[in-house]
Every structure is written in structure tokens, then in C-alpha cells.
Amino acid sequence: MQTLNDIRSTFLSYFEKQGHSVVASSPLVPRNDPTLMFANSGMVQFKNLFTGVETRAYKRATTAQKCVRAGGKHNDLDNVGYTARHHTFFEMLGNFSFGDYFKEDAIPFAWDLVTRELGIDKSRLYVTIYHTDEEAAAIWKKVGVPEDRIIPIATNDNFWMMGPTGPCGPCTEIFYDHGDHIWGGPPGSPEEDGDRFVEIWNLVFMQYEQFEDGTRRDLAAQSIDTGMGIERVAALLQGTNDNYATDLMRSLIEASADASNTDPDGPCKTHHRVIADHLRSTSFLMADGVMPSNDGRGYVLRRIMRRAMRHAHLLGAKDPLMHQLVPALVQQMGAAYPELGQAQSMIIQTLLQEETRFKQTLERGLKLLDDELSALGEGDDLPGAAAFKLYDTYGFPLDLTQDALREKGRGVDTDGFDAAMAAQKAKARAAWSGTGEAADAAIWFDVADAQGTTDFLGYDTEVAEGQIVALVQGGTATQTAKAGETVQIALNQTPFYAESGGQVGDTGVIKTANGVANVTDCRKTADVFVHMAKVTEGALSVGEAAQLTVDPARRTAIRANHSATHLLHEALREALGDHVAQRGSLNAEDRLRFDFSHTQALSHEELARVEADVNAYIRQNAPVETRIMTPDAARELGAQALFGEKYGDEVRVVSMGRKEGSGKGLSGDTYSLELCGGTHVRQTGDIGAFVTLGDSASSAGVRRIEALTGAAALQHLRAQDQRLAAVAADLKAQLADVPERVRSLLEERRALSNEVAQLRRELAMSGGGGSAAPDVKDVAGTPFMAQVLSGVTGKDLPGLVDQMKEQMGSGVVLLIADADGKAAVAAGVTKDLTAKLSAVDIVKASVAALGGKGGGGRPDMAQGGAKDAANADAAIAAAETVLKG
């Protein structure tokens, strides 16, 4: 049997032999493409190559691309688990040509691989072509496909377009016939939606460029983009038409069944399929840097998680289930995707945390759903307001509610739901709409085309000469910028670092023979370094030579913070575990901030250890070295790459610190080794000192450490010393004695507080704390004592209630404390009466009479509160009503 891993290997090896570069899958989060939620096809990472914006060293490429379809236009979530072929996560195998070969090679490659390498029966294969693509039809005949199995299609299903304008072209598709025991007809027939004929490979011929007026012209460089769904091919090679019966999916389904002690098939079949599919998408999304949250990509991830968790609940799983299945996934897919194994610990922790949290509300939410349904007529849809309440109160995404109702044959009033959510949706749309930067950025692509990209000189110098190649004001190119005007400046080369990788952009001065500009920031678009500046003297013009000077003191501080971030990252991994991975950073001149994957707050001891380790490697004063190499070579040396980051053919590797036996670096003794394009100190000692300001939560599963280095760290320590000295002076103690003196004062305060509380209770018991000492009255045969007290707090009441119960022997006590107008209520029932009376009921009635809500406790002791104690008599009367039954 050819496993899914075998098929992937066969595909990539075949095209490598045909001169293709094997390119690693891009992350699921598309880089620099806010228009796309997740990568959903193999061509996503090559988009700029097809449009000509970018060039690479290769003209032919092959990939196995991770894809997710859940959310937005491409959304398969609702169907997953209920059909044989829908997935939220899938792999797309593809081969690509960027102006190299075209149809005459692409079609024979596809036929040869499918029939000879994979061994698929030719008699079961059909192909479709675009109805006017006679060239493709002729090539298919030439490779041996009978004419009656070449099906012309006139619809857009066989014509691909990148957008309203731009590259486009016809498609040809290969279909597999599963046999007449399955309903369905060939493509183009009325029965084409059946499952008998399944598309396994789509070849797109990027042949034309379409213009706004609808006309098309031949592209100068014609390209190939193909996509083969590996799950579908695995199914047919393993003798099934069900993707979930393939080796990989079956292993995950059986892991789910084992963990839940249920049958993998039968009534539980759908639940296991949902869990198996969603395990893949959630794990790979987290491995690529997406963490569960309440907006954007993180919200889509949380929706997928919660859908799987509901199905785990339906299996009867009492404990969190999803995290138990991660090792089975890593075993199956970790070799092909190493990032999955690297993130395994973090994925397990995050899934456990999310499922534990969600289980607390899931049962209550499902009960609310059942209550709402029981109030409806037979077959009625759930009102939108109720669906929104499930979303707003219990965190049920709409699709999870729809999924639950689907099993009951019900639907949801989605219009009502949308109306209830209008405000949130408007806010979300505003957040996603951006600020117009995309339109402003277009001009820099034109600059890159006309003038080339910017050469960065700043690794080696902070002063350089360059030539102004473009000036932009208000999104429009200009030839001159005058004193007092703000302007964006592009040069052929620059020492100014452009903001990226968490490091802020440089500031400084640009000076020409005719003018001076202060640079306030530097950013990068289309590999053009854009200097944000204000002209302070004279004027600047395109074509002028310029003297470029980076603010040296600011750059020095930024270097120190960025290098300290690398040491901090490694120290955290050693202190907390390999699951720690960078989730974000800020390397500014005055501070650094580092976000990392970890699910709980650091203890004081852990934070102290991390700080000490960083300072130890600073004192080591080891050289900071950089090398240029391929990403694969860097990873072989043990370099840390950022989750979700896509690297080019060459990367810059920064190493610092020495640690015997680390196994990293060329000599196997490097402490920190990371892929990084930022600027760094020359020796770790240049950082000076490192002081943490604390640890906080950044988002779910992500912690944040803020810290200072160098002079800022020393200033912080001096300020701390001054504060401590001031405390010592107030305490009239030596600095070394301050902790003991503070502990002694706290003990004295605690003893005095206890003494005051005891005196208040004694005063209250004697009748001096409010109304006179109460008499015991008979209410419906039950001894009842009630009193309103002042000078006591709610914390005092339980002790007073117990004392009064003991004095009474048998009966009920109600105490109301009036503290600055607010009411604290406590009630007690002696043990002999708790079978028929509950202190909880008495407190709730009294609190309600005072205008409050709630109250709780045990049958023999309960407490509550309200904002106003003025209606104490009504509260006592309400308690008597409870006693009377």
C-alpha cells in the first residue's frame, strides 16, 4: 500500500529529477498578504513570481503545501466530518514553472507521474480541457488519452483568473473514476456532482494577461501552476473513495477512539472524523504562529478547536481529549513538517488549556440550547437572539451552534443572529479594512521596478553616501521637497535599518548640497527602504547625492536590546522548555519586549534564573557572529527560526555566547543561534546589563517579558535603590534590615486587626454595636434572632452568627451589618433544623428585600450583600416569611 507519506515523497522526487527545486511549504499565514486569511493553495507563496514582482534563483519548483480552508470565501468547516472529502486542513502537491516550460511539458509530466510513478490505472482516468484549448487536447492525445476521454468544458471551472485583471489562462484537470457502484457522472454531465468521478489534479496554464476592457494578450513569459490534493490520491491508491479511510486519517481516528474508549466507526464515526481533521488544522496553525484569540485568524482557530471539543464531548469524554492525540499526529507528519515536532509541547499545552476552559461552559451552553429548543414548536429554527446569547455568553461560534442543531434537524435564524451582532461585525470590518496603506504602497513597487531595490549597508556602518532615487508626498511622486515639508525618501543604498523583525527603524539625518532632512523612521516596501523625513533646511531633489548619518547613540541602544532578546529567548527555552518560541518582539532604543509561547506566569524564581542567565552570557563577552547560508543549512546547525516566517534562499544566521555541549553552531558549542536580519552588538559585553521589568499575559498561551539593557538598566536599578533607601529611612532601619522590619510591621498589623475584630464582635454581642441585644422570638415554632449591627464588617458576621447559634442551642440567626450605608447579610440555622430550613433561602430573601441579588453558602451558614441597608426591617420580615413557609 502506498501511504500518504510515500505519495508525497514520490511526487517531490519525481519533479526534482525533472529539474525542479524542492521548495518547503510556506507558513499557513501568508506573508505580506492581508487579503488572504490562510494559505489555501500551492501557488500562494509564488504569487509575486507569477506577477513578475519577484524573481528567484529557480525557474522550476515543486512543493507539498500546507493549506487551511476555514473562514472567509474558502470555508469547508460546516461539511467536515459529514462528507468523504471535505477538510479544514489538506496538503496540495504542485509543480510550477515561471516562464520556463509550458503545456508541451506539463501535460506529459502529469501523465507520466500519475500512470507510471503512482501506478494509477489509465482506464479509470478522464481529463477535461477548456473548450477552446485545442493545443492541450492535442497533447493529451499525443500522450495516449483516448479522444472520448478528453472532455471540453466551456465554463469558468476550466479557466483560471488571478483577479479581474492580470495573469489568467485555461485549465486541464485529471479525473479518476471510482466505478459504477458509486453514483455520479463524468465532468460536464448532469450527474457530475456525484462521488464517482473525482478530480485529482488541476493544471493551470498562465497564458494570457487580461486587461480592464476584457481583452487578453499572450504573456511574454507563460507559466504553469498545478495542484494535486494528496488526500484524494491516497484514497484511490488505497482502494477507497473516502479520504477518512486513508492511512493517515485512519491512524488519527483510531487514536481518538482509543483515547475516548469508543468505537472508531458506527454511531461515533462523525465525531472521530471531525476530531481527526480539526486536530491537523489546529496543530499546524499553532505551529505556524497562530494562537487562539477572539479576533482574526486566532478566532478562526478557536472556532475549529471548539467544534472538535464539542464532538469530543458527544463521545462522552470526561477529560480533555484533543491534546492526547498530538503525538499521533507528530508521528505521522513530523518528518515531512519538522515545525510540528518543534512546537509539539506548546501545541499540547495550548489545547489542554483551551479544552479545560471551554468544558467549563460547554455543558451550560448546551443546556441553554436544549431549554431554548424545548420552548419552540416542532421543527422550528432557533431564534437568532438565542444563538447570539450562546455566542456572547458561552463562546459558542454560530457554526458550532449550527453543527449542534444539524444533528437535531433544526436550523438557526441567521438574519436575527446577524442583527444581534451588527455592532461587533461593523467593528471587525473596520479593524480588517486597514488604513489605506496598501494603496500608498503601490508607488514603491513602481519605484522598485524603475530604480531597483535598496542596498542595505547598515550592518557595517552608520554613515554612508547614497543617491536619492525617489521622493513621495501624499502617495504621489515629486521631484523636490522643500524646507518644512514632510517627505518619504528612497535611495539607491542606505545605512538606515528599516523596521522589521521587531526592530524599530533608524532615525538620523540626510544631507545634500542643497538641503537637510531629519529622518524620523525607516520602513520597507517592495524591498525599497522608505525614509520618513522632514526637510529642515533648503530642499532635496531626485538625483542628488546625499550624506546619510544614522543616530549613533540610538542605534547602539537598539543593537543592545536586539542582542539581549536573542539571549533572553535561549534563556527562556532552557528555563521553561523547548515549547518556548518567539511570538513577537519589540527592540526599541529605550526598552525591549519579548512575547513567547507559554501557558502560565513565570514564578519569581524562574524569572530570576532567566535574568541571571542572560547576564552571565553578557559577562562572557563572547563575539557576536553572522553568517549567510541556506535555511536548511541553518536548521542543521540548530538555528531557531520564527514560527510562521517564510525565509528566502539565503538567510542571515546570528550566533552569540558559548556553551559546551549545546550541539549548535559549527563547533557545537554556540549558546544562541537564530535566523535574524537585524543589527546586533559586536560582543555580548556591549549589552552592558540586563534587567527584567516583569512577566505578563500577552494573549491566550502567550506571555510577555519587558526588560531594559545598558544605561537604562542601570538607571532602573539606581531608582530602585533610591526607593529602597527612602523606605529604610521611613522605617529608621538599615537597608539590610528592611525585609525583616516590614515583616515585623505586617505581623503587628495583623495582630491588631484581629484584636479590633474581636472587640467589635464582643461589642456587638453585648448590644453595643447597634440595636439592643435582641430577644429570641418564635416564628412559626422556630426560635428566631435578628439584629442590625454597626461598627462591624461582613467578615465579622459568620463568627457572630456561630456564637449566637451556640447561645440559642436551636434556632435561626439573621445579622445585617450596616457599613457606610451598604448591607452585609449573614444567616445561620442550627444543625437540628437544616432538614427543613436553609440559611441560603433566608439570605436570598433578605438580600432581595434590600434591593440586592443572590447570596449563597451552606444550609447552616450563608452570606450575601446589597448596596443599601436602609430597609433592614423589610429584610428581617422577608426572613420571617421564609420561616413561616
From Swiss-Prot:
Zn(2+) binds at residues 562, 566, 676, 680. It comes from the Bacteria. One of its GO terms (molecular function) is aminoacyl-tRNA deacylase activity. Binds 1 zinc ion per subunit. Its EC number is 6.1.1.7. Its cofactor is Zn(2+). GO terms for cellular component: cytosol. The keyword RNA-binding applies. Consists of three domains; the N-terminal catalytic domain, the editing domain and the C-terminal C-Ala domain. The editing domain removes incorrectly charged amino acids, while the C-Ala domain, along with tRNA(Ala), serves as a bridge to cooperatively bring together the editing and aminoacylation centers thus stimulating deacylation of misacylated tRNAs. Belongs to the class-II aminoacyl-tRNA synthetase family. One of its GO terms (biological process) is alanyl-tRNA aminoacylation. Its main location: cytoplasm. The gene is alaS. Catalyzes the attachment of alanine to tRNA(Ala) in a two-step reaction: alanine is first activated by ATP to form Ala-AMP and then transferred to the acceptor end of tRNA(Ala). Also edits incorrectly charged Ser-tRNA(Ala) and Gly-tRNA(Ala) via its editing domain. It comes from Roseobacter denitrificans (strain ATCC 33942 / OCh 114) (Erythrobacter sp. (strain OCh 114)). It catalyses: tRNA(Ala) + L-alanine + ATP = L-alanyl-tRNA(Ala) + AMP + diphosphate. This is Alanine--tRNA ligase. Keywords: Aminoacyl-tRNA synthetase, ATP-binding, Cytoplasm, Ligase, Metal-binding, Nucleotide-binding, Protein biosynthesis, RNA-binding, tRNA-binding, Zinc. Coiled coil: none annotated. Disulfide bonds: none annotated. NCBIfam families: alaS. The keyword Transferase does not apply. It is found in: Cytoplasm.
